[in-house]
Amino acid sequence: MSLRGAERRSNLKELSFLRRQESSLFFWIPTFVGKTKNAMPEPALSDKTRLPRSRWSLAMTRAKGLAMTVLFLFFPTITFPFMPDTEIASFQKEIAGKPVGERIALWAEKFVGTPYDPDPLGEYVTKKVIVADERADCMYLSFRAVELAMSLTPEEAVNIALDKRFINRGKLGNNGKVLNYEDRFQYGEDMLDSGRWGREITEELGKVTEITGSRGRGKVKMVSKEDLLKSLRSSKSSSSLNLRDGDFIFFIKAVEKRKVGEIVGHIGIVKIEQRAESREQRAIYLIHAGGVKNKGGEVKKVRFSEYINSMPFIGIR
């Protein structure tokens, strides 16, 4: 799927939305260490019995290390913000003149290295928030990259999220919490078929195969893994594929592996890196949240051809 030709909505109303507050634990860490230091002053001993300065420093260093070890044993999920709103706004302004697809790819790349969201529902859904950038699954990465790319401010990105993440439209309570996440897009195929996330380009990528659908879909079109690999081998490069920056790749699960009728098993975002003016000198990458629910992983940037070769899916849309 591609958002080629999509333009930023100019009539979006400004929305006053307070981004989630930082966790108190985030600010508590230095306080904890400081109290440890103050609670262990250098003992007032006589000159004959006073510890040498180097030994006292070593003892204090070990005490601090022990304190931090205990802290992280009890609070192993402490995380740091992805980007503060000031940096988000600055980057939005910096890339505002680029095509929307390129902006999507650049924002997706910003998430590379972000821990995978192991929450089965998605942490953003469980917490009923729009912004939860500390962790990402493939759906959240797709949502957020588009929202940030199509907006000029963090607040505007939230407004776009209310329009795009939901089958109808998202609603926020007075406390900034989402009231109707049950109305969100939960299936990749629903996103694709809605037409609200761009134009489908499946038939432009290669030979189309039909497989059994589900949830009201009789048949579903895709380019099979085998045909895609043949195209990659025959051209000796993925550069011949009609892919552009910001294109979404929806990976199709085998019918027998579906658990709740899902057709799409994963989503990734294309990023093109041009080595020269020649089309043959461009490299195609896939940015995706690689992980397993209840286990972990991270957002990765990998060669498109390498991912296709090793992926557990039967095709793409």
Outline where the language-model segments fall:
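Catalytic nucleophile-His microenvironment captured as a short glycine-rich beta-strand/loop
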Residues: 248, 261-274, 282-288
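A mid-sequence, solvent-exposed acidic-amphipathic segment
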Residues: 209-258
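N-terminal capping segments
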Residues: 80-218, 259-260
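A mature extracytoplasmic/lumenal domain signature
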Residues: 253-255, 288-291
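C-terminal regions of proteins
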Residues: 290-317
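A cross-taxon signal for low-complexity, glycine/charged-rich
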Residues: 8-14, 20-25, 34-37, 41, ...
